[in-house]
Amino acid sequence: MDERIPCKNPQCSHFILPATAARTEGYCMPCVQARYRQVQEEYIRKNRKTIDAFSGITNPVEMLKLVHEPREHDPLIEWIPCPIPTDELYKKLSDDESRDMVDYAEELFDSGWQEEAQEIALCLAAFTQANLDNFLRQVINEEELELSSPLPFHRAPPDVRDALLQKVETDDENRDGILCALAWIGDEVVVEHFNRWRQEPPAWSASLHILPHRYAHQAGWELTENGRRRDLYFTQCTHLVKQAPEQPAVFRAVAEYGENCPHCSLPLINLFEVAPSAVGLSTQGWPGQIRILTCQCCTAYNTVFATVDPQGQPRWYEKNALSTLAVENSADWITLPLDVLHPGESRLPLFAAEIFLPTTFSQLGGHPAWVQDTDYPTCPTCAQTMMFLAQLSYEDIEEEEYAEGMLYGFICPSCQTTATSYQQT
């Protein structure tokens, strides 16, 4: 066997065969690959072009078309991002401009760019009041019903609803997505069908991971005992931003509580302090201010509940589950900064209802943006599903590049019980 010789790179400790050295000018393969990458990166650095496709364009429709334009990755091109956030562009659209974007989505869908078309439809459904009836008809008439998101169906016309009710009986492959779309429609006819399926589960329900009527949670509602719709979120919705308002509001996000967690010893916080009227709740529905008590470490592992005493003060729920992981990690836990987010502009209730929407997610009221699965907690007092109150995105409050995840706050107006949970990718 030939004796191995050292790599020509003085910083490298590898040895190679003479035959390899003859082919690589004396370098080992890792060093050859590193030199190739270095040459390639230098070529890209010298030849890369910066392109501003938005230069001189002020029309929001034209800007949005560029935002949604599919582009293949090219290391020699650096695209300057749109100077206006995507959600702000959609908010600027007039009624006519919204119709132009709907027409554009329909054209893309017909041309085979279905993913891009559904992306636009999702934004229109969340950020505007655009009429998507014809687009939804296009989607359900496809042989292969592929839904990027069922949210756009929340304003679907009766004929689309009826077509989906027919499809759900026979389309085994797409039944899950169809039920989600029906849940988002959520009108009286859908509620009636969901209630009927609850009373007499259809044969095809055996193939589902949850019962058909449980899909209502995907769209923020559920059936009551008497078969009516009960919403699980407040339609009055306010964006939470770092900029403090000119007029101080009766609101705080992440406020000191004054006691330590009985499980992990980290200081407890009120995740939210909210006036009931901020979400349209009457004082009879919740006397005094809503204070959602939690431990920001423990709630990362388990749902944390709290009760309200006769004086309106939150108290730790004694039966909260103990997390050994929280106890182990609390000493190194990076706590949230206090009182950073404040009420901003009002927004539509579904503005941040889908985690893939191009927006910021911290908000009071509205529909939650689930990072993982839909997970409304059950009130430990009355066993009723709790209502979503507010959410805080770590990306909106933390400066660290890798900050992620969402904290959710819930209330049971009947019992004055609160809960918090956490989800991340």
Swiss-Prot record:
Q: Which InterPro entries match?
A: DUF1963, YwqG-like_sf
Q: From the Swiss-Prot or TrEMBL record, give the protein name.
A: Uncharacterized protein YpfL
Give the organism, scientific name.
Salmonella typhimurium (strain LT2 / SGSC1412 / ATCC 700720)
- Which gene name does the record give? ypfL
